[in-house]
Design a protein with these regions (language model features):
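Asp-based, Mg2+/Mn2+-dependent phosphohydrolase catalytic module
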Residues: 1-9, 16-20, 26-27, 31-37, ...
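Hydrophobic alpha-helical segments within soluble ligand-binding/sensing domains
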Residues: 73-77
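Conserved phosphate-coupling serine/threonine residues in phosphotransfer and NTP-handling enzymes
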Residues: 43
């Protein structure tokens, strides 16, 4: 049906919306599997372990196999292992991200003065004091961000995401991050393709954000499909340059669209 060896799917806004499956998403994912295509679920949510994501999606009714979930938190951990293997890392973010990094043997510090790397990320308990400490930690340290998502859609309304926290740190320090990880970065695309063991030309990426999901796919040479069940609107799609290869009301329409390919 697909003509693709692999499919990379966003989660929030694509498969799930407001904590519930997008109507038709479970069946669409099952039909993709029937084609034999490798499936990867890639979320820019850095706060959850892939295993936790898998359990949550399974509870919602999705079939998710081991190794089929990638997050911006994991991409960040791999970046730190490659580029800063022994450097103390100060996190401006949530405990879930700290736990994920610690589980991968990253050297975390609570002391802003000891930081060699500062990781900015979503923080739903962000305060002035945390901003102050993050600013102090950035003095002489490398600045990285887990992902650029300024907002996340919840129950039809936007909530501040990692990008908002990173922007606060960047504004206070008057500097941009040296690396922004997660989608749409080149490192994120490489991490995804490594996991599905496919080249970009045989991979389809599906998501609800033009600036992350589809930008990653377009830059890497993947085929792109925009779903309108999350952030992007049809007007956004019409104005996009380059235009998505597919524009769908939701992932439920994907099997039929690919059948005509």
């Amino acid at each position: 049906m697909t003509g693709f060896e692999s499919v990379v799917l966003d989660v929030d806004g694509t498969l799930v919306r407001g904590g519930d499956p997008v109507p038709g998403a479970i069946g669409a994912l099952d039909r993709l599997r029937e084609t034999g295509a490798d499936v990867l679920l890639f979320s820019n949510n850095p706060t959850r372990e892939p295993a936790s994501y898998r359990e949550w999606l399974a509870d919602l009714g999705f079939e998710v196999r081991p190794g089929e979930v990638l997050t911006s938190g994991v991409v960040t951990a791999e970046y730190l292992a490659d580029e800063h293997p022994d450097d103390p890392v100060y996190v401006v973010g949530e405990q879930g991200l700290c736990d994920l990094l610690a589980a991968r043997d990253r050297a975390l510090t609570d002391d802003p003065e000891a930081a060699a790397v500062v990781v900015g990320s979503i923080d739903r308990e962000f305060t002035y004091d945390r901003l102050r400490d993050g600013l102090w930690a950035l003095d002489g340290a490398t600045f990285v961000a887990t992902d650029p998502d300024r907002t996340i859609p919840v129950d039809g309304r936007p909530l501040p995401g990692s990008g908002a926290i990173v922007a606060a740190l960047a504004g206070a320090a008057d500097r941009d991050p040296e690396a922004v990880l997660g989608k749409p970065s080149e490192r994120a695309a490489t991490a995804a393709l490594d996991r599905v063991r496919a080249d970009a030309g045989s991979c389809l990426v599906v998501g609800d954000r033009l600036d992350t999901d589809l930008a990653m796919g377009e830059r890497a040479g993947m085929t792109t499909a925009l779903v309108l069940s999350g952030v992007a609107t049809r007007e956004d799609a019409a104005a996009a340059d380059p235009a998505p290869d597919y524009v769908l009301e939701s992932i439920a329409d994907l099997p039929a669209a690919l059948a005509d390919r």
